[in-house]
From Swiss-Prot:
This is Large ribosomal subunit protein uL22. Gene3D superfamilies: Ribosomal protein L22/L17 (3.90.470.10). Pfam families: Ribosomal_L22 (PF00237). The gene is rplV. GO terms for cellular component: cytosolic large ribosomal subunit. The keyword rRNA-binding applies. HAMAP family: Ribosomal_uL22_B. GO terms for molecular function: rRNA binding; structural constituent of ribosome. It comes from the Bacteria. This protein binds specifically to 23S rRNA; its binding is stimulated by other ribosomal proteins, e.g. L4, L17, and L20. It is important during the early stages of 50S assembly. It makes multiple contacts with different domains of the 23S rRNA in the assembled 50S subunit and ribosome. The globular domain of the protein is located near the polypeptide exit tunnel on the outside of the subunit, while an extended beta-hairpin is found that lines the wall of the exit tunnel in the center of the 70S ribosome. PANTHER family: CHLOROPLAST 50S RIBOSOMAL PROTEIN L22-RELATED, LARGE RIBOSOMAL SUBUNIT PROTEIN UL22M.
């Protein structure tokens, strides 16, 4: 038995992709997500290609997945796509310990984050 089909929550001109369990803090991931919010998909890919942030590789992979979802699943025009939303959420936090002096220990927090990218097809503006 399969699960019942859910209604599509996004409008017909949007597609999304989600990347979970990214091993980076949400604060650092949000710095890269701010680069692509509101930009055209091609320009956002170029920005991520030449970004020096380590997590930009994973953000680029998620954006490419959203573009592929728009093209293959929803029949949207790739050239007219804009990154409408880029949400960053908190994931789990792995806790490790580091031995310190005098038999004490220090905590090391290894945070994870989640990224949701929504791309929208915009209509070409008619120039007069």
């Amino acid at each position: 038995m399969s699960k019942p089909k859910r209604e599509r929550v996004l409008p017909d001109n949007e597609a999304k992709a989600v990347a979970r369990m990214l091993r980076v803090s949400p604060q650092k991931l949000n710095l890269v997500a701010q680069l692509i919010r509101g930009r055209k998909a091609a320009a956002a890919l170029a920005d991520l290609q030449f970004s020096r942030k380590r997590i930009a590789v994973d953000v680029k992979k998620c954006l490419e997945s959203a573009i592929a979802n728009a093209e293959n699943n929803h029949d949207l025009d790739v050239d007219a796509l804009v990154v409408s939303e880029a949400h960053v959420g908190k994931g789990i936090v792995m806790k490790r310990f580091s031995p310190r002096g005098r038999g004490r220990s220090g905590r090391i927090l290894k945070p994870f984050a989640q990224l949701t990218i929504v791309v929208r097809q915009v209509e070409a503006e008619a120039s007069a």
